């Protein structure tokens, strides 16, 4: 006995179809007996695909999304006059550039003063396309890969914040994001003593309270840091330092009642220190 021959498929077993549209393609088979072939569909994803039983035209019931489902499988049966033939059909969805890049990263950045580094702007693209970055403005710079820098080293005491607009493109679509870069204030300025280096008072300090009111060393710190005052070089030493200073206020006093006829000039060095720098006068 000779087994009956079924229809022979002429189409490939793998088809490709673009996302966002329903068209797939056509299956085609011929019957060796010359009869008209009809078609049916079954299998894993048959419920998602429509098949014209006469023409073999395949369509998605709804347009596919590559990012959701990018491959479908079904079994096509070609029905002949004597026998049938099955073909497992794979339909691969083509990924189109149909998604605009997005900015999941924060629009707020920080960078230390006195250096150019800031950080990296990060955008994503659901299509997996290569992204390219650009920026508007003159104070900030960005590489095509998103590395963000200051054009020149910032000084917190001059400018504390910068703004710009970053653009990202996937080659077809683009998106803008306004960003802000806040400058971190570092302790990069030494205190400056602003008061005169000479103080005077009437001899004969009566009681320690009057002695404390001899004068005050004034200083400023551009970084706004707390300052601490100290006496470092008494000259000449008389039972300890000739004078002392309040570490917080900078108020100075002799350590004893002054007598003009005994000594009328006292010299020493006062240092004012913040946490990292110092200045003296």
List each language-model region with its residue ranges.
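Acidic, turn/loop-rich segments in luminal/extracellular domains of secretory-pathway
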Residues: 1-8, 13-102, 108-116, 121-192, ...
């Amino acid at each position: 006995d000779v087994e009956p021959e079924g229809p022979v498929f002429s189409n490939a077993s793998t088809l490709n179809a673009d996302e966002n549209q329903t068209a797939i393609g056509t299956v085609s088979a011929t019957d060796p007996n010359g009869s008209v072939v009809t078609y049916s569909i079954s299998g894993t994803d048959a419920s998602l695909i429509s098949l014209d039983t006469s023409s073999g035209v395949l369509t998605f019931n709804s347009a596919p999304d590559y990012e959701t489902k990018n491959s479908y499988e079904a079994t096509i049966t070609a029905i002949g006059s004597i026998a049938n033939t099955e073909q497992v059909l794979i339909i691969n969805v083509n990924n189109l550039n149909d998604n605009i890049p997005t900015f999941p990263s924060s629009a707020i950045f920080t960078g230390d003063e006195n250096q150019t580094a800031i950080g990296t702007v990060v955008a994503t693209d659901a299509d997996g396309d290569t992204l390219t970055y650009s920026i508007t403005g003159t104070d900030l710079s960005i590489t095509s890969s998103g590395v963000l820098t200051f054009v020149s080293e910032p000084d917190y005491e001059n400018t504390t914040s910068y703004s710009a607009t970053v653009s990202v493109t996937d080659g077809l679509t683009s998106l803008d994001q306004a960003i802000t870069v806040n400058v971190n204030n570092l302790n990069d300025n030494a205190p400056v003593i602003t008061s005169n280096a000479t103080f005077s008072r009437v001899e004969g300090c009566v009681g320690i309270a009057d002695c404390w009111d001899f004068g005050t060393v004034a200083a400023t710190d551009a970084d706004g840091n707390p300052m601490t005052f100290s006496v470092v070089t008494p000259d000449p030493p008389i039972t300890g330092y000739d004078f002392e200073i309040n570490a917080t206020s900078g108020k100075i006093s002799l350590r004893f009642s002054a007598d003009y006829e005994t000594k009328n000039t006292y010299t020493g060095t006062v240092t004012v220190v913040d946490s990292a720098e110092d200045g003296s006068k």
